[in-house]
Amino acid sequence: MAEKNDSRSSITSVAEKELGLLSRHLDVLKTVKEHGPIGIIRLSQMTGQPQHMIRYSLRTLEKGGAITPSPNGAVITDDVHETLGTLESTLDDFTVTVQDLKKKLK
């Protein structure tokens, strides 16, 4: 059984890591949307993520145009809905890709 898990992680580890990162970014974005303006310490407390991971997520979300810093903490931008729409479309594409990969296994 251990071989199976090792094999699984070596084949899919990058994808799993990136999906985990995406999940964290979405958790941070949702928290900013619901509680903003909000600072790093409070985000860390609310999400249970270390502050350095919160900083990275905030930088990524800011670069993507979903949030912006303010004197009182991070706030969502007017572009957040466009960002979420693009993300939803991309996840739909991922779903199709995953289904195609499953078909290749058969």
Question: Where is each model-derived feature located?
Answer:
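Short alpha-helical segments that sit at the start of domains
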Residues: 2-27
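Amphipathic alpha-helical dimerization/coiled-coil segments
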Residues: 2-3, 85-106
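Short amphipathic alpha-helical interface segments
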Residues: 21-37, 45
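Residues within the helices of the helix-turn-helix
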Residues: 30, 40-41, 59, 72
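Short amphipathic alpha-helical interaction segments
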Residues: 48-62
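A short, conserved structural fragment
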Residues: 62-72
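Minor-groove-contacting beta-hairpin "wing" of winged helix-turn-helix DNA-binding domains
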Residues: 72-79
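Short His/Asp/Glu-rich catalytic/ion-coordination signatures at enzyme active sites or charged loops
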Residues: 82
